[in-house]
């Protein structure tokens, strides 16, 4: 618990993202929690895991836990989006989270989805100079962000450019993407902690969680009129979901 009595809420981004995706909701969370948004290994400012370590959700969770311990945080509330939601669920499984709120988490599909035929990040990396110029055009920028948000026009131009270029430049993208597509989340024997699974009704990337992939007792919410990463679509709705999902005392 922070000096102001607020409990820590760890915020984890999705594949190709960075801690910046949480910027629209940080101020809304600060009245009730001590929000801490961090970059996952291989994204944003964080170096990837060691070459011999598969960047699976479980291994990313272990790395995040070590970072929390270094900051003096033992069992925070944890919230994540997409891959970050899966990492949050793995932290809960390992006993490293007091509660979990996962927004459109990856991994809750029926079976491993396999590798994509076309590596879009590789092509975008090769065309980076052209993409960078195109991002200054509002219409093109919003088209690039349309799978990310239901309302890309609500993402400020500077933030939109950072999102796309951050995805292109993420050194950990390939490995994490491969690992994500190779595994599924296993809810067997999940600890009895509060778990909220929230899905944007306009999510164009990931469908709702398969019933057999949901931890026993998990609460399921459908978030109206928002997409895969809804922090710009409706910051107030996202903040309320995170505050409600973490409305239990931090475990000792």
Annotate each PLM feature:
Residues 27, 194-226, 232:
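Conserved loop-alpha-helix segment in the C-terminal half of the alpha/beta-hydrolase fold
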Residues 93-130:
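Flexible "cap/lid" loop of the alpha/beta hydrolase fold
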């Amino acid at each position: 618990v922070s000096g102001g009595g607020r409990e820590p809420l760890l915020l984890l981004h999705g594949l190709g993202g960075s801690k910046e995706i949480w910027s629209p909701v940080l101020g809304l969370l600060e009245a009730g929690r001590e929000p801490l948004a961090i970059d996952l290994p291989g994204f944003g400012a964080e170096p990837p895991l060691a070459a011999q370590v598969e960047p699976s959700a479980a291994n990313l969770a272990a790395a995040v836990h070590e970072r929390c311990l270094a900051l003096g945080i033992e069992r925070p509330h944890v919230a994540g989006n997409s891959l970050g939601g899966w990492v949050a669920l793995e932290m809960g499984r390992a006993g490293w989270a007091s509660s979990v709120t996962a927004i459109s988490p990856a991994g809750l599909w029926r079976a491993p989805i396999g590798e994509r035929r076309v590596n879009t990040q590789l092509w975008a990396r090769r065309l980076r100079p052209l993409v960078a110029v195109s991002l200054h055009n509002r219409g093109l920028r919003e088209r690039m962000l349309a799978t990310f948000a239901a309302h890309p026009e609500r993402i400020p131009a500077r933030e939109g450019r950072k999102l796309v270029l951050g995805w292109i430049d993420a050194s950990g993208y390939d490995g994490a993407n491969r690992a994500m597509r190779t595994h599924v989340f296993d809810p067997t024997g999940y600890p009895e902690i509060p778990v909220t699974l929230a899905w944007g009704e306009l999510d164009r990337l990931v469908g709702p969680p398969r019933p057999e992939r949901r931890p026993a007792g998990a609460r399921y919410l459908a978030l109206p009129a928002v997409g895969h990463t809804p922090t710009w679509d409706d910051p107030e709705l996202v903040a309320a979901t995170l505050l409600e999902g973490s409305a239990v005392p931090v475990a000792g």
